[in-house]
Amino acid sequence: MRSRSSSLEDTGKAGLSSPRGGTRRDQANHSSRRPQEATPTIHRNHRQREHKPKPKSRDLTRDDLLFLLSMLEGELQARDEVITVLKAEKIDLALLEAKYGFVTPTAVLKSLQRDGLQQSSGWQEDIYEKPIAELDRLVEKQRETHRRMLEQLLLVERAHKHTLHRLEDEKKNHRDFMKKSDDFTSLLEHDRERLKQLIDQEKTYQERKEEESNKQVTNLKDELTKLKSFALLVVDEQQRLTEQLSQQITKVQELQNSAGQAQEELNSAQTRLQDEENKVLRLEEELRKQTCHFHQEQDAMTAKLTNEDAQNRQLRQKLSSLSRQLDELEEINKTLHRAEEELQELRDKISRGECGNSSLVSEVEELRKRVLEMEGKDEELIKMEDMCRELNRKLEKEAKQSCSLKAEVDKLNHRIMELEKLEDAFRKSKQECNSLKSNLEKERTMTKHMSNELDVLRVRIKELETTEVHLEKTELTLKEDLTKLKTLTVMLVDERKAMAEKLKMMEDKVQNSTGKLQAEQDKVNTVTEKLIEESKKTLRSKAELEEKMCVATRERDELKAKLKTEEEKSSDLQSKVSMMKKRLQSLETVERELLRNKSKEEHTKSPGPYRYQQEDNKVKDLTQEVERLRRKLKEMKVVEGDLLKTEDEFESLEKRYSNEQERAKALMEELETSRKELSKYQLAEKEESNQEQILYKRLKEEEAKSSHLTREVEALKEKIHEYMGTEESICRLKTDHTTLQRKLTQQEVRNKELAREMETLTRELERYRRFSKSLRPGMNGRRFSDLHVSTKEVQTDPTDSLSPNYKNLAPLERALVNGKLYVESDPEDEANYNEIHLTKCSPSLMNSVNNLNNNMRRVRGPFLKPRENHHAVNNKRQNGNHVQQGDVVLTHSPGQPVHIKVTPDHGHNTATLEITSPTSENAPSYTSTAVIPTTGAPPKQRITILQNSISPSGKPKGSPPPPESPCTPDRSLSPLTMTAYSQTLTSESCGPLTPDRALSPIQIVSVTTGSPDRSEPAELLGGQTVLRVSPERQNSWQIQRSNSTGPNVITTDDNKIHIHLGSPYIQAVTPSAKPIGPYYSLGPEPRVPVLNNGTPAKGNNKITSSIVIKPTSGPISRPSQITVSNLCD
């Protein structure tokens, strides 16, 4: 395992090549981590030098030398850049805040500081001007608070005197009150005698009243008999009238029913009439239309018939003329036939010659002429025949037409018959309509008559209703009269009963009043006795209070004197503090000048980051001083707040006292008013002692006054209770005085703490001087503080040659537990004075403790008072190492080996650390997981070791432990947070030691007890290991604080385990490391491959480092030995 200085040199000179031996060794360390033997570092380095082959002498040309020079210049420039970067990273935030005034963009401020370092510009401002100004303000504020305290004490003294005067006044008032109470008892006795006389008078009055009431009862009985007879007559009349009313109501109802039925019939008849009228009107319109149509058709037909008749007549006339002509022609034809026959006969005769003569020939000739004429007439006859034929044809046509006309006429006759039938029906309907109209008129007349009758009935009903109303009114009046009579009778009976009851009640009241008077007399006697006893008690309490107030005044004077002495002490301490500050400032100036001169001389030799470690140490001390001053400021503010609270409480007490005085005044006024009322009552009694009504009034007034007296007695009791409340308020004042005294004692304790802080400051000054002396170079270039440590190997034996600066760190370690300052105070004031947190941080001890406090639980570690009990052994040095109270010391039985296995898993970039004790069966085993860095940067690791298979603790994390037994099993139930400090001091085998190696930051190994099931985020400080130990296993292990000059140390009894993980100068980037991957459990001494810059070699993936602690026998008081194996598989 490499030491811290070598790892720091690796981080500062990674990737640089120089002809120096240190850089070559660093390159060799980066390229391959060789297994180192368990021998001291100096011997190993000498062995390496012996085995190094000497480089062959080679003549180089000028060009080669120039090339080498250019390469070296480039490497030097790169080294300077790395140095500036590391300086900027390691610069304290407090310095940045002091220079730039703000801290928030840290990266920007660091880059500005880095540029300033490259330009070699130093600090221009003084950082500690503001704290000095704040100290001056604090001194002025303390003076003001002192003045205010004195003013408040004067006000309290005045108030005390005022309360004493008030108590004397109260005594006088109480005496007066006792005298008045005696007068009041005498008045009550007189009232008792007067009430007895009143009771006798009341008895005589009641006897007279009984006689008068008996007379009134007899008179009322006679009146009752008369009223009963009158009431019977009234009831008979009422029954008769009700019967008449019922008969009239039935008649009215019958008439109303008949009228309703007639109205319904009328309504139905009216509906029927309306329907029939509508039908008749419709039929009349149809008949009118049909008659008009028939008349028109009849006129047309008659016109046609007349025309046809005329034509028929003409034709008949023609026929008759033609028939006549035919007859004439037939007769002529007959005559002609006869003439022809005669002619033929004649011809025959002529031919025959029978007869011949001239006359006949003339006759024949005449006959021939006639025949010719007749032939001419035959043509006419033919024409006439033709004409007759045409006429026959026309006649046939006319006959046909006449037949058709006859048919039409028949049809018309049928229709006329139908129309006549319709006319008959119409006539009948008209007759029916006329009859219906007549019926309607009759019904209308009937309805008018009925409506008139209805109106008459309504008028009669109204009259009946009015009569009903009058009857009801008369009935109501009669009922009212009856009820009045009944009520009168009942009232008379009730009055008689009431009079009897009143007589009994008056007797009972007289008896009750006598009993009440006796009870009130007893109460008054008891109240007077109680008042006398309470007055005696108040006098005693007042005397006791006066004594207590005298004692309180004495105590107050003593407290004032103590305050003055404490203030003088605080002023002396402040003056000493100012002197120490001035001395510190002068020393700082001297140290700055020395450091500037040394930095100019060693700028070419030593690397850059170590220059600023001296400034870091100075900043450490100054930040501690600033934090102490801030704590003092906070304490003064708390004292001011307490004083303000006491002022408010005193004002509230004054208000209460004034309220109680006002109440007492009000009670006295009420007593005076009651006395005035009693005097008025006595005067009124003397004036109106003979009147009866006044006796009733007096009885009521006496009852009211008795209640008033009871109220006054209650008010007196309340006043006594209020006096008791004043006593309680005085007790509270006493408690306030005790709290003030307690606070004064706390102030004294704080002054003692200031004195102790002064001692610590003086020790720090001495340590600072020793540091400055140790920083001066020695004879061979080394520093005096580094001469006793020269190995890179893990130291297993205890060393008593501790550096003087860490011997002086014990008070600091007592004052700082887990990054917080704890003040021991009384348990009552723990809420006000519990913890004061540190605010500023630096890369020094305060910075590391504060960063550790962010991830650890709070623990209140008492450190001011030394514990003189059976646990004081834990404060002694064990093996030269100081064990602090508040740290858990884990003991382990000697003679048993402890195996520590480290099994990395490069698939997940984690490593598992396992601590076991294989021999004991019930020994606890612890496992942990850390992240392995894969880049070339230096490792940043924090290992959280958890105990395997333990039950979680019962208490919560934040519960504070008892302060009496910090290292005993009594504290196993509460989780604890423990810190151990150790300084990392490294040596270099070749080359002069740099001044920064003795001033490396303090490494912290923390052991936290608590429930392991909650995995808290782990923040890495450089080279920090966190062990979690369950509360059940605290009795078997012991972790001691190591103040040796080696790296981080966890000790088991007399054995030491020094575990170094990474560079202390580089802060953590990854805040948490979660256990990922399986745990590999290998043998006790497995071989592991070599790591190149934090990455595994190309062999097997499993790398295991184990530390086995085995007991050895020898004359040295070191019973265990550490075997470190780091071998390849």
UniProtKB/Swiss-Prot annotation:
It comes from the Eukaryota. Belongs to the FILIP1 family. Residues 43-55 have a biased composition (Basic residues). The keyword Coiled coil applies. Residues 909-932, 1114-1129 have a biased composition (Polar residues). One of its GO terms (biological process) is protein localization to actin cytoskeleton. Pfam families: CortBP2 (PF09727). Residues 188-776 form a coiled coil. It comes from Danio rerio (Zebrafish). GO terms for cellular component: actin cytoskeleton. Keywords: Coiled coil. The gene is filip1l. Residues 1-59, 563-582, 894-975, 1110-1129 are annotated as: Disordered. This is Filamin A-interacting protein 1-like. The lineage of its organism: Eukaryota, Metazoa, Chordata, Craniata, Vertebrata.
